[in-house]
């Protein structure tokens, strides 16, 4: 799959993420809970100020890490002053 992206809700973006993305983060490490596989993604603001994962998101989709209809929980945290993201899939 090409050109896949994940866009977060405005309220979530404003409250939790936008303080980290004054400029895009080109090397956000994203991992799936329960695996050791990590993916490098780009986190940036969309034109309507929502946070958006772009480059690399399609790798998660191609890896069949989750299915349509699954609920995903996104856990952003700082590790050694670096923002990282762990994705939990609730089936």
UniProtKB/Swiss-Prot annotation:
It comes from the Eukaryota. One of its GO terms (cellular component) is nucleus. Keywords: DNA-binding, Nucleus, Transcription, Transcription regulation. It is found in: Nucleus. GO terms for molecular function: DNA binding. InterPro entries: B3_DNA-bd, DNA-bd_pseudobarrel_sf. PROSITE patterns: B3. Residues 1-91 bind DNA. This is B3 domain-containing protein Os03g0164300.
């Amino acid at each position: 799959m090409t050109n896949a992206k994940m866009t977060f809700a405005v309220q979530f973006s404003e409250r939790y993420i936008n303080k980290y993305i004054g400029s895009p983060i080109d090397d956000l490490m994203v991992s799936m809970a329960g695996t050791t596989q990590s993916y490098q993604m780009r986190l940036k603001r969309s034109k309507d100020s929502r946070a958006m994962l772009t480059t690399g998101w399609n790798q998660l989709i191609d890896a069949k890490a989750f299915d349509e209809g699954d609920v995903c929980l996104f856990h952003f945290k700082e590790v050694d002053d670096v923002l990282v993201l762990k994705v939990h899939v609730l089936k």
